[in-house]
Amino acid sequence: MVFSRFFRVTGVNLSRRVYSRISSSSSPSLESIPWIHKASNFTLYGSFHASSVETQVSANDASQDAERICKILTKFTDSKVETLLNEASVKLSPALIEEVLKKLSNAGVLALSVFKWAENQKGFKHTTSNYNALIESLGKIKQFKLIWSLVDDMKAKKLLSKETFALISRRYARARKVKEAIGAFHKMEEFGFKMESSDFNRMLDTLSKSRNVGDAQKVFDKMKKKRFEPDIKSYTILLEGWGQELNLLRVDEVNREMKDEGFEPDVVAYGIIINAHCKAKKYEEAIRFFNEMEQRNCKPSPHIFCSLINGLGSEKKLNDALEFFERSKSSGFPLEAPTYNALVGAYCWSQRMEDAYKTVDEMRLKGVGPNARTYDIILHHLIRMQRSKEAYEVYQTMSCEPTVSTYEIMVRMFCNKERLDMAIKIWDEMKGKGVLPGMHMFSSLITALCHENKLDEACEYFNEMLDVGIRPPGHMFSRLKQTLLDEGRKDKVTDLVVKMDRLRKTQLVG
């Protein structure tokens, strides 16, 4: 059986802290759950979850030290951040701080603390990349006043770049502040930069990718041939934006205008058009554009094959998906992980898990994976098919490091199964590796804790969420407040509301 070849036997040890946390809860202990106990006897070509792996040395010292710092910072609720960092005993460098700030991109308050700590170390100077990483993190919690203060600081230190303004614009756009997003690009001229066609395209791209393609189209129509001459990239950005909205009528209009202006679709434009039709489930049209591209001697890219395999596979048109996979093999491009992942997904949609596992074996033989995305696809489909036992086995035996997305899938699965002890076990594994949870993972766990009436624990995680600077979604906060009120804990609700208002209104100080 292919599934049995997918694994080899090993033992999996629980840390004493995690085990005591699970066994002390009202739920049964880990060993009392038959399918989980069985699952712990498998591993996939070397597990990254066993405690012995923690002694492995990373090839990149900065990356290794950054991971260690993030692990230390998960304890920040018990100590001051500065104290923890002073005790970290790492070799400080701009590259290290940049790596840490990127890992803290979902924790703006922590990121700012690390930035300020490094700045106060003797002889240390931040780079443009460090500032940009902090701006990205602060933008996620809408600390725009502080961000512009950092821009002034960068200007004084001659560290400003056009990338800085693009980052700020993107954060405004994702906060649905379209006027400010456009203004951020124009503001670069106030700081001595000349706005060029590439910046115009970047503005369009920022708006389009934040689901504001209508505004991007207005900017395009207003500015074309007045300040900027659009090029084929300008049109492909709009094609992609309208494609994301599944507005094929506008995709067709932009395509026609592009041709009228003398720009024939290139492989990028065709890829976007084909992907848009696949997402809209217009597969005959997608294939028609594919054939048109080949007739024009425009060679399909691996991305185009991925779009078709993904789309056809999701509609359980497995034979058609397999045909395009075979065509991709003979296209002249080496097969890469995304193409294999598309095939894995196609098999999963048709519930042919044996073939999905065979594909993973082939990826390994070819040296192109599997990667975390491969496992995320398999886990998603196993959970969709109510095969939780198998999903946990696959998770335990991953041959690469899980990403925050992988952890989120597993935490959500156990929350939905009302196995909070296991959800918290996965959570602790993740934080033990220096990976910080995002908003959706906090929301899943807190909502599940409310459902189980574990309100003290729910409040504990809610406070942790606020402490790192993550704003909770409204529906989750409402659920927590109502559950507390139902239990007569009005004082606790008042405390949380005050803390939420403080996070919402308080501007961090740089």
UniProtKB/Swiss-Prot annotation:
Q: Which InterPro entries does UniProt cross-reference here? A: Mito_RNA_Proc_CCM1, Pentatricopeptide_rpt, TPR-like_helical_dom_sf
- GO cellular component labels: mitochondrion
PPR repeat residues:
127-157, 161-195, 196-230, 231-265, 266-300, 301-335, 336-370, 371-401, 403-437, 438-472
Provide the alphabetized UniProt keywords. Answer: Mitochondrion, Repeat, Transit peptide
Q: Which Gene3D superfamilies match?
A: Tetratricopeptide repeat domain
Where in or outside the cell it occurs: the entry states:
Mitochondrion
Organism domain of life: Eukaryota
Organelle targeting peptide span? 1-14
Name the family the entry cites.
Belongs to the PPR family. P subfamily.
NCBIfam families to which the protein is assigned, alphabetical: PPR
Q: What is this protein called?
A: Pentatricopeptide repeat-containing protein At1g71060, mitochondrial
